[in-house]
């Protein structure tokens, strides 16, 4: 990638037309396929007797030409018997070129980001990359906010709108025409986060899909972030690379200097951001201290914004106004809500005594028990009512493998949902997995669950014990009552960077 960035630096005189020639370079295909993206690299290999496998520029050019043809017949390799045969595949050429396009289009975007960060010291905290790092912020902020907007990002997006969005960072006309061809080849119905994965064939065009989707979301966020920063006097400059086309940053700095010079008295009033904003996958969450009328105005602003700017018909029912999270919302596998804890204080002044009733808002993160039971029922660990059943698909494995797989699922769930306010739902899920494991083993040995568990004894449950329980009881405190109280509270971990399959075979 650095080689191609240097290539762009040396050719700034024709910087607007640099991308399309890169698509015909052999080395860019080698770069893409060496990144282990899951492709069948043999399609770009030139196989001849007496020669080693090499990436052929002629094959690359033919891929571009054959995209315009009606009959798609390719030469692929059968990995089972290594014999070549002809298989009709209409989309494979476009899949290869779309991945290369995504890699090339990321170059100018990354260069603009790096140029915007020059001269600025940015501390990188690895802990902030954890999924759990956002929940302490929610606990601190959301309990003091009045209203929350729960927004589903609208889709699908028309291909022409995507091309218009990407042209702000990719100015090569030829590449834009190629992008339009790829979009009409696959995405006649628009780009969605989930639906397009099937259109592009799973694990084959995810990079291209994410590039398109992130471009669309970035365009939405650019205008929203500008409005949000206005509420806090435009103090944020972290989105400079993506908002360069608006040319307002010089005005921003000038406005800030003038404001701090002449309006020092009311500067403190605006230090707290007016709106807190969180995005995860296809959902936005906006929280504010404003009134219900103000949040309603924001709701209809977003509706008009998507309809006028992206030509998307957004129904207002896709945006929910929740008053201080009285109704729980789903977010990153948790159920978020704010509960009012009443408290009574007795006060006495001379001979008069009176009671003061006060309510304290408490942010709660709950385990979505019903949705987890539905997932377990889908994978045949229990029925729809939550009653554990055996797992016949694992009955052929050894006893140690069966126990290890069930134990890994319990530990992963305990690790991820350790921050839940109430762990009753988590205990129920772990009970389902333990009993399902016991019934699977009893089914394998043609015995009863009671007899099998009596034979194994306590060794059976050791695999299901989460190690952090022992850490809390042994390290934090030796008092059993204190350790139990600490364990019932939320425990957030900063080493969860992605959510893997719970039944993953990798430790």
UniProtKB/Swiss-Prot annotation:
Pfam families: Intron_maturas2, MatK_N. It is found in: Plastid, Chloroplast. One of its GO terms (biological process) is tRNA processing. Its main location: plastid. InterPro entries: Domain_X, Maturase_MatK, Maturase_MatK_N. GO terms for molecular function: RNA binding. GO terms for cellular component: chloroplast. Keywords: Chloroplast, mRNA processing, Plastid, RNA-binding, tRNA processing. PANTHER family: MATURASE K. HAMAP family: MatK (MF_01390). Usually encoded in the trnK tRNA gene intron. Probably assists in splicing its own and other chloroplast group II introns. Belongs to the intron maturase 2 family. MatK subfamily. This is Maturase K. The lineage of its organism: Eukaryota, Viridiplantae, Streptophyta, Embryophyta, Tracheophyta.
């Amino acid at each position: 990638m650095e080689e191609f960035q240097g290539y762009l630096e040396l050719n700034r005189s024709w910087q607007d037309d640099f991308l399309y020639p890169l698509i015909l370079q052999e080395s860019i295909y080698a770069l893409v396929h060496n990144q282990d993206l899951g492709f069948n690299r043999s399609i770009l290999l030139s196989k001849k007797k007496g020669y080693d496998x090499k990436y052929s520029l002629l094959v690359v050019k033919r891929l571009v030409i054959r995209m315009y043809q009606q009959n798609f017949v390719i030469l692929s390799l059968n990995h089972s018997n290594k014999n070549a045969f002809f298989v009709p595949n209409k989309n494979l050429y476009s899949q290869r070129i779309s991945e290369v396009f995504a890699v090339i289009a990321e170059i100018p975007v990354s260069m603009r980001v790096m140029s915007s960060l020059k001269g600025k010291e940015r501390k990188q905290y690895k802990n902030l990359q954890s999924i759990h790092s956002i929940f302490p912020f929610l606990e601190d902020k959301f309990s003091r906010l009045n209203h929350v907007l729960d927004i589903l990002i609208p889709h699908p997006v028309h291909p022409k709108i995507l091309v218009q969005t990407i042209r702000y960072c990719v100015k090569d006309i030829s590449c834009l025409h190629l992008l339009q061809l790829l979009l009409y080849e696959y995405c006649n119905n628009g780009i969605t986060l989930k639906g397009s994965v099937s259109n592009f064939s799973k694990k084959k065009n995810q990079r291209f899909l994410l590039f398109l989707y992130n471009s669309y979301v970035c365009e939405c966020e650019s205008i929203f972030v500008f409005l949000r920063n206005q509420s806090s006097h435009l103090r944020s400059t972290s989105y400079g690379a993506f908002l360069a086309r608006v040319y307002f940053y010089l005005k921003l700095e000038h406005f800030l200097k003038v404001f701090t010079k002449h309006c020092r008295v009311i500067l403190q009033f605006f230090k707290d951001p007016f709106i807190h904003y969180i995005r995860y996958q296809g959902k936005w969450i906006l929280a504010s201290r404003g009134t219900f009328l103000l949040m309603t105005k924001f709701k209809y602003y977003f509706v008009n914004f998507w309809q006028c700017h992206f030509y998307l018909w957004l129904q207002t029912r896709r945006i929910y106004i929740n008053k201080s999270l009285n109704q729980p919302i789903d977010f990153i596998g948790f159920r978020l809500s704010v509960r009012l804890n009443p408290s009574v204080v007795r006060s006495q002044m001379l001979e008069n005594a009176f009671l003061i009733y006060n309510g304290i808002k408490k942010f709660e993160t709950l385990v979505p028990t019903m949705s987890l039971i539905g997932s377990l029922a889908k994978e045949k660990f229990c029925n729809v009512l939550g009653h554990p059943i055996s797992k016949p698909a694992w009955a052929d494995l050894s006893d140690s493998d069966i126990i290890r797989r069930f134990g890994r699922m319990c530990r992963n769930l305990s690790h991820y949902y350790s921050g839940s306010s109430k762990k009753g739902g988590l205990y129920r899920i772990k009970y389902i997995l333990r009993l399902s494991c016991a019934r699977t083993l009893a089914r394998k040995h043609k015995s009863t669950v009671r007899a099998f568990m009596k034979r194994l004894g306590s060794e059976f449950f050791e695999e299901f014990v989460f190690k952090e329980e022992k850490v809390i009881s042994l390290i934090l405190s030796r008092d059993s009552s204190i350790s139990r109280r600490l364990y019932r509270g939320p425990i957030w971990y900063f080493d969860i960077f992605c959510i893997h399959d719970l039944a993953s075979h990798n430790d």
